[in-house]
Amino acid sequence: MTMNGIPVKLLNEAQGHIVSLELTTGATYRGKLVESEDSMNVQLRDVIATEPQGAVTHMDQIFVRGSQIKFIVVPDLLKNAPLFKKNSSRPMPPIRGPKRR
């Protein structure tokens, strides 16, 4: 079983939302996040690509290798994602030891 960190879990929560990627080459991609993997590989749909020189291109879909991603911008609404909530619904542990009178 693999242990996923917060960034990978957040990326999984962002599936179905519009995200922006900046690559190590300086290119940026903005589109709907279709799929993300534990290795940070992502698939985007309805993508607007902007090259470092400023050329803008529209693509139906694109797959980006995680090692080529410099950073990812996710929607602000994900700051309220369940993975950031404290698990306050856990019951208090029982009191142990002899009963006091």
Curated annotation (Swiss-Prot):
Keyword check for RNA-binding: yes
Alphabetical UniProt keywords: Cytoplasm, mRNA processing, mRNA splicing, Nucleus, Ribonucleoprotein, RNA-binding
Places the protein is found: Cytoplasm, Cytosol; Nucleus
UniProt xrefs under Pfam families: LSM
Cystines in this chain: none
GO BP term, pick one: mRNA splicing, via spliceosome
GO terms under cellular component: catalytic step 2 spliceosome; commitment complex; cytoplasm; cytosol; nucleus; precatalytic spliceosome; Prp19 complex; SMN-Sm protein complex
Keyword presence, Kinase: no
Sequence ranges assigned to domain Sm in this UniProt record: 6-78
Alphabetized GO MF terms: mRNA binding; RNA binding
InterPro entries, A to Z: LSm4/Sm_D1/D3, LSM_dom_sf, Sm, Sm_dom_euk/arc, SmD3
Superkingdom of origin: Eukaryota
Assembly and binders: Component of the Sm core complex, present in spliceosomal snRNP U1, U2, U4/U6 and U5. The core complex contains SMB1, SMD1, SMD2, SMD3, SME1, SMX3 and SMX2 (Sm proteins B, D1, D2, D3, E, F and G, respectively), and is probably a heptameric ring structure. SMD3 specifically interacts with SMB1.
Known role: Plays a role in pre-mRNA splicing as a core component of the spliceosomal U1, U2, U4 and U5 small nuclear ribonucleoproteins (snRNPs), the building blocks of the spliceosome. Also binds telomerase RNA and is required for its accumulation.
Family the entry assigns: Belongs to the snRNP core protein family.
Record's protein name: Small nuclear ribonucleoprotein Sm D3
Organism of origin: Saccharomyces cerevisiae (strain ATCC 204508 / S288c)
